[in-house]
Swiss-Prot record:
CDD domains: AdoMet_MTases. GO terms for biological process: peptidyl-arginine methylation. Essential arginine methyltransferase that can both catalyze the formation of omega-N monomethylarginine (MMA) and symmetrical dimethylarginine (sDMA). Specifically mediates the symmetrical dimethylation of arginine residues in the small nuclear ribonucleoproteins SmD1 and SmD3. Residues 14-357, 366-690 form the SAM-dependent MTase PRMT-type domain. Belongs to the class I-like SAM-binding methyltransferase superfamily. Protein arginine N-methyltransferase family. PRMT7 subfamily. It comes from Drosophila ananassae (Fruit fly). This is Protein arginine N-methyltransferase 7. Keywords: Methyltransferase, Repeat, S-adenosyl-L-methionine, Transferase. Coiled coil: none annotated. GO terms for molecular function: histone methyltransferase activity; protein-arginine omega-N symmetric methyltransferase activity. Its EC number is 2.1.1.-.
């Protein structure tokens, strides 16, 4: 059966009714759960299997029976490993029913249906005697995330030891260690705080108010593939230090909240702005089988791994790739200036049941440092990438060049469309007679109002809807300006909402009004990802176990719930270009309502496996041939077939993953259909063999 659901269309800005199957939410959860990513993590799989073999063999040698509990079994892969390693009994629990049903079929397909007791419950709901005949003496689980404890591992382990495990139970993993490294990074700092906006001569146009400068920001992690952060963009100020240990095996309760004050020493002068964070796990009791999530420069096996990898693979990519356990950046509330190498300071580390936070101070704090939150609206309103985008110098200069060349003091009247458009506010500082900002979002508007007040801008008016602008005001406009950026946008072309807003008032604007951007172009680039394609690639088998039933389940769900193009920050996921970029859509905002139906072929110029197509938008600020009139959301440097692509680090690009990625092709057929009045933009891509 099917039902109708209200869905916001980002291009039209309106809710529309879409017919969807009753189980659409289930399919969406299955398709986006990330199980496949974990199953492609060869190091995780091999080391879990090795730890099970080693631990079960040692328990056997000690004369013990082995009764295994697998919490959050997923596909059942760890349960099957435990059986293969010689466990006497295995109980697996999985609360996500679609996954539990799939696990049941996978266990049967691998001959383990009658050997694994599958419980469709959370582990915290399991009762001994009712669900399990006895307590387990070996727990195997994967309950961790990038932050280690963000999925509730502390509470789950505490409950398991209290209710489900014997006094002498062992755990895989046995323990975890968390690490921090204090660093300075002008680039990463742009993701956290708002800088002054200056004109092309470097003179300030807009200054952030005191409430922004004094805000401590959000304590939450910024999860990134830290190995992909260019080495020239940061300076480690300390060596990595161990900050917390979590003993998953001990019977005593794991504390839900701890504070750790470490006296550390700088290895060079700089500003202690942020903390790089990662963890490792010792999978066996003896600590011999180690899995590290460290970035490449701190990875304990970097020399061994770099010797095994091909010479054409960049050093940051020799460490095992995974997207479910990344690294994180935590921003220090008030950066600490370290004036010399060898300077001692205090790193304050804290965790509660689900999260961590940090501070750095010259003197030891007198009491525990509370978890900080945003008090300025910036961090609670915008994503990290958007905050960075607002600070992005090269991008801002192109917009400011247009504004400085076109805004006439005491003559220009400007309408700004978008959310949080500081560049639009800059037109007021440049002398525009009036500036009207379309800003319907409550917190974004409050932030901009504070900037207007602090910079004493007298000619700025906010409007909730473009329809509220009086006809006489529209008729007197000299400029309509946008970046464009809208809070509801996920994919780059979702910001075509600018065209929708413009179309509502176009007939009331003077003929000579200047509209910027005047047009937008979408480009497509066939690429070969090193790893990102694995999040959608079939698993087939894992450590000798047949997982094709899992692939079929995910494929069915993906067909119903996954868009053909998804948003990804491609700077974190290296890929080689297989051709030059090709334009697949050009939208003229003066004729936005026109439909487009296009198709073509991209010839591949470099041999490789096309396992992805990257897509992005170039905004044309003014209709001329200067490259400085283009603001791109795609590559930050010219693309060369066969070379790695360098991507804009402050926006997400679109990615299409072909269904078949294991064959060499000579060209890629594409088609684009754009119906702006309906807000429908779709792409198709078809591979052509040589």
């Amino acid at each position: 059966m099917s039902c109708f659901s209200q869905v916001l269309n980002p291009i039209t800005g309106e809710n529309s009714w879409q017919e969807r199957e009753d189980d659409y939410d289930y399919h969406q959860e299955v398709a986006n759960a990330g199980f496949g990513d974990m199953l492609h993590d060869w190091e995780r799989n091999q080391k879990y299997f090795a730890a099970l073999r080693k631990t079960i063999a040692e328990m056997r040698t000690a004369g013990k029976e082995v009764h295994v509990l697998d919490i959050g079994t997923g596909t059942g892969i760890l349960s099957m490993m435990a059986l293969e390693a010689g466990a006497d009994s295995v109980t697996a629990c999985e609360a996500f029913l679609p996954m539990a049903n799939c696990a049941e079929k996978i266990l049967a397909a691998n001959g383990a249906a009658d050997k694994v007791r599958l419980i469709r419950k959370r582990s915290t709901d399991i009762q001994i005697g009712e669900d399990m005949p006895r307590k387990a003496n070996l727990l195997v689980a994967e309950l961790l995330d990038t932050e280690l404890i963000g999925e509730g591992a502390i509470g789950i382990y505490n409950h398991a030891h209290d209710e489900l495990l014997t006094e002498d139970a062992l755990c895989i993993p046995a323990r975890a260690r968390c690490y921090a490294q204090v660093a300075q990074s002008p680039l990463a700092a742009q993701w956290n705080s708002l800088k002054s906006l200056a004109n092309l001569d470097g003179e300030p146009l807009l200054q952030p108010p005191a409430q922004l400068k004094g805000c401590k920001g959000e304590a939450g992690l910024h999860d990134v593939q830290l190995s992909q952060l260019p080495s020239h963009t940061f300076r480690p100020l300390t060596d990595p230090v161990e900050i917390f240990q979590f003993d998953f095996q001990r019977k005593k309760q794991r504390e839900k909240k701890r504070d750790q004050l470490l006296k550390v020493q700088s290895n060079q002068p700089g500003s202690a702005e942020l903390v790089f964070y990662w963890w490792d796990i010792q999978l066996d009791d003896g600590g011999e089988i180690l899995l590290s999530c460290a970035p490449y420069w701190a990875h304990p096996e970097i020399h061994e791994l770099s010797g095994k990898k091909g010479k054409d693979l960049p050093l940051p990519n020799v460490v095992p790739w995974r997207d479910h356990w990344m690294q994180a950046i935590y921003y220090i509330p008030k950066p600490l200036q370290l004036l010399e190498a060898g300077k001692s300071f205090h790193l304050s580390c804290h965790h509660d049941e689900y999260s961590l936070w940090f501070d750095a101070r010259e003197e030891a704090p007198a009491k525990s440092v509370s978890r900080h939150t945003c008090t300025c609206d910036l961090h609670m309103t915008y994503s990290r990438s958007r905050i960075g985008q607002m600070n992005q110098s090269t991008r801002n200069k192109r917009y400011l060049r247009y504004l400085e060349e076109n805004i006439e003091a005491e003559k220009s009247k400007v309408l700004v469309l978008g959310n949080g458009c500081l560049l639009g506010l800059a037109s007021s500082a440049l002398g525009a007679t009036s500036v009207q900002l379309h800003e319907p979002h409550r917190f974004s508007r409050r932030l901009l109002e504070s900037i207007v007040q602090h910079n004493q801008l007298k000619n700025v008016e906010f409007v909730d809807k473009v329809e509220e602008v009086e006809d006489s005001q529209l008729a007197g406009l000299t400029h309509v300006f946008a970046e464009p950026y809208f809070l509801n946008a996920i994919l780059p072309w979702d910001n075509f909402y600018f065209g929708t807003l413009l179309a509502k008032i176009k007939d009331k604007l003077p003929e000579d009004v200047k509209i910027s951007p005047c047009s937008a172009r979408i480009y497509a680039l066939p690429v070969e990802f090193l790893d990102l394609h694995k999040i959608r690639a079939p698993v087939v088998s894992c450590e000798g176990f047949d997982l094709r039933l899992f692939d079929e389940m995910v494929e069915r769900s993906a067909e119903q719930a996954v868009t053909l193009v998804e948003a990804q920050p491609l700077w974190e996921y290296p890929c080689r270009a297989l051709s030059e970029p090709q334009e697949i859509l050009n939208v003229d905002f003066n004729k936005f309502s026109e439909e487009h139906h296009l198709k073509g072929t991209i010839d591949l110029k470099h041999p490789g496996t096309c396992n992805g197509v990257a897509l992005w938008v170039d905004w044309q600020l003014i209709n001329d041939s200067s490259p400085r009139s283009i603001v791109s959301t795609g590559p930050s440097e010219a693309v060369t077939p066969g070379e790695f692509v360098k991507w804009d680090m402050f926006v997400r690009q679109g990615v299409h993953f072909p269904q078949k990625t294991n064959q060499t092709i000579s060209s890629l057929a594409w088609s684009t259909d754009f119906k702006p009045l309906l807000g429908q933009l779709s792409f198709t891509f078809g591979q052509k063999k040589p």
